[in-house]
Swiss-Prot record:
Listed transmembrane segments: 20-42, 69-91
InterPro entries on file: AIM11 (IPR038814)
Family designation: Belongs to the AIM11 family.
Name used for this protein in its record: Altered inheritance of mitochondria protein 11
Cellular component, GO annotation: membrane; mitochondrion
Organism domain of life: Eukaryota
Membrane topology per record: Multi-pass membrane protein
Highest classification ranks of the organism: Eukaryota, Fungi, Dikarya, Ascomycota, Saccharomycotina
Localization in the cell: Membrane
Gene: AIM11
PANTHER family membership: ALTERED INHERITANCE OF MITOCHONDRIA PROTEIN 11
Gene source species: Candida glabrata (strain ATCC 2001 / BCRC 20586 / JCM 3761 / NBRC 0622 / NRRL Y-65 / CBS 138) (Yeast)
Keywords for the protein's UniProt record, in alphabetical order: Membrane, Transmembrane, Transmembrane helix
Length: 137
């Protein structure tokens, strides 16, 4: 197996994992959104033909508040998860340290050489092999 094959294989595996995390967060958020919509629809009071529409049915405000808090928290966390996983997938960020390094380079607080030296030993070995191949030509 050559160096480019190793790099492309590892990258495709990582990007597939990021894609699955993104789609998992999206499907969970859509499920919570459907649950929220169904919950709102069941709470809607529609009187029958001979019932008064001015008489409000009894309900527990405590359970209503708990349900609203739980559903809104679920939607907020879901949107946050979609945003985070989508951002990491689009920018090919695989870990928190990778994110930190990318933000430092974005704001010009880290040198490019320092960014490259902070990677793992396996990556350094692959980089050295690539540089040797390039310099050989």
């Amino acid at each position: 197996m050559t160096v480019p094959e190793i790099i492309s294989d590892g990258k495709s595996t990582r990007r597939n994992l990021q894609k699955l995390l993104f789609f998992g967060a999206t499907s969970a958020t859509l499920a919570i959104a459907a649950l929220t919509s169904r919950s709102i629809a069941t709470r809607k009071y529609i009187p029958t033909f001979f019932q008064l529409n001015t008489k409000i049915p009894t309900f527990s405000s405590k359970s209503e508040a708990q349900a609203a808090l739980g559903l809104s928290s679920g939607l907020s966390l879901g949107i946050f998860a979609i945003t985070t996983t989508g951002f990491c997938w689009a920018l090919d960020i695989s870990s928190a340290s990778d994110f930190k390094q990318r933000m430092k380079t974005l704001f010009n607080t880290i040198d490019e050489k320092e960014y490259m030296n902070d990677s793992d030993p396996e990556t350094n070995k692959i980089i050295e092999e690539l540089e040797a191949l390039i310099n050989k030509k």
